Amino acid sequence: MDHLPMPKFGPLAGLRVVFSGIEIAGPFAGQMFAEWGAEVIWIENVAWADTIRVQPNYPQLSRRNLHALSLNIFKDEGREAFLKLMETTDIFIEASKGPAFARRGITDEVLWQHNPKLVIAHLSGFGQYGTEEYTNLPAYNTIAQAFSGYLIQNGDVDQPMPAFPYTADYFSGLTATTAALAALHKVRETGKGESIDIAMYEVMLRMGQYFMMDYFNGGEMCPRMTKGKDPYYAGCGLYKCADGYIVMELVGITQIAECFKDIGLAHLLGTPEIPEGTQLIHRIECPYGPLVEEKLDAWLAAHTIAEVKERFAELNIACAKVLTVPELESNPQYVARESITQWQTMDGRTCKGPNIMPKFKNNPGQIWRGMPSHGMDTAAILKNIGYSENDIQELVSKGLAKVED
């Protein structure tokens, strides 16, 4: 198979990935593959472009390194072209409502007839099967969080709150990436394709288990946090200093002992409630939990962030300033690692945003292209799989494909 024109780089060079999906979850999986060197083809509707394009800046990040194919994959010759593309594809990712592809005649079995080794990742809110009440429902970030038990754990004591920005979308997209790579590893051993059913709510159910396991195995449900503080442990979470906010984790025998001396609670060490060797202070079970919070709040409020960071470094207490977005660019760690970078958009503008992550030492990722326009690579992709100029024009004339104007 000849690949589309692009530089060769990263650990996934030579891999062909195709995805069909809008907004964030499914495309995020595709983006990860593209930044790690895979050739990634982004399928868009012919009549309506991906709704993410209405955003002014985010798409330049989320759709960089992609090849844009505008094709009606469910109808007539458009469907034929899609299935021909699948013959040269390693991984196909689709994000839709339940078994939408199967309902429209593109089942796993149809895809495997064209490519027995194909890895297929289905990403939806509620999965490919289950009850009709849920399976075919649309789902976004907040829906998946609400249905999974994740949302109810977040927020404040007075009201639950979803985690933003769009946590369920990113977790689900990354799950699709890792699951597809796991499946591909097995396919290369067996020669038999795989189909993966990724339900966004199940992803969030798995991510939200730290506290829920206590309910499933004893009936105890953890309360929500208070003003950003850990719901279980004193000295953990968000705190206010004289000039801003920090997060800290008061964990460890010596850390607690030394911190208690600073905040005036050394006399509690070695008591039945806080015996020698205590590594965590339970804010509910320990009767002194509220007092620890009161004293710690007062001490932190009387010191600047710089003073707190210096003292906590001496005590080996983990803490960090809550950075504002403008502070990111000038932070020395960001600068040293080039965590924020710049690249050129297709129309020649400079775009700034997050760099490739993670950092591969021997086969690093690369930003080689900005977001392509709607249908920009349709002709090149169709030619790559054997279509002539006349074939492509016929698809366009029938409204089954769109090429760049």
From Swiss-Prot:
UniProt cross-references to SUPFAM superfamilies, sorted A to Z: CoA-transferase family III (CaiB/BaiF) (SSF89796)
Record keywords, A-Z: Cytoplasm, Transferase
Superkingdom: Bacteria
Catalytic activity, EC: 2.8.3.21
Active site: 169
UniProt cross-references to InterPro entries, sorted A to Z: CoA-transferase_III (IPR050509), CoA-Trfase_CaiB (IPR023452), CoA-Trfase_fam_III (IPR003673), CoA-Trfase_III_dom3_sf (IPR044855), CoA-Trfase_III_dom_1_sf (IPR023606)
First and last residue of the signal peptide: none
Any one biological process term the GO annotation gives: carnitine metabolic process
Pathway the protein contributes to: Amine and polyamine metabolism; carnitine metabolism
Enzyme class: transferase
Keyword Nucleotide-binding: no
Assigned GO CC terms: cytoplasm
Catalysed reactions, semicolon-separated: crotonobetainyl-CoA + (R)-carnitine = crotonobetaine + (R)-carnitinyl-CoA; 4-(trimethylamino)butanoyl-CoA + (R)-carnitine = (R)-carnitinyl-CoA + 4-(trimethylamino)butanoate
GO MF annotations, alphabetized: L-carnitine CoA-transferase activity
Family the entry assigns: Belongs to the CoA-transferase III family. CaiB subfamily.
PANTHER family: L-CARNITINE COA-TRANSFERASE, SUCCINYL-COA--D-CITRAMALATE COA-TRANSFERASE
Described purpose of this protein according to its UniProt entry: Catalyzes the reversible transfer of the CoA moiety from gamma-butyrobetainyl-CoA to L-carnitine to generate L-carnitinyl-CoA and gamma-butyrobetaine. Is also able to catalyze the reversible transfer of the CoA moiety from gamma-butyrobetainyl-CoA or L-carnitinyl-CoA to crotonobetaine to generate crotonobetainyl-CoA.
Protein name (record): L-carnitine CoA-transferase
Organism in which the protein naturally occurs: Escherichia coli O1:K1 / APEC
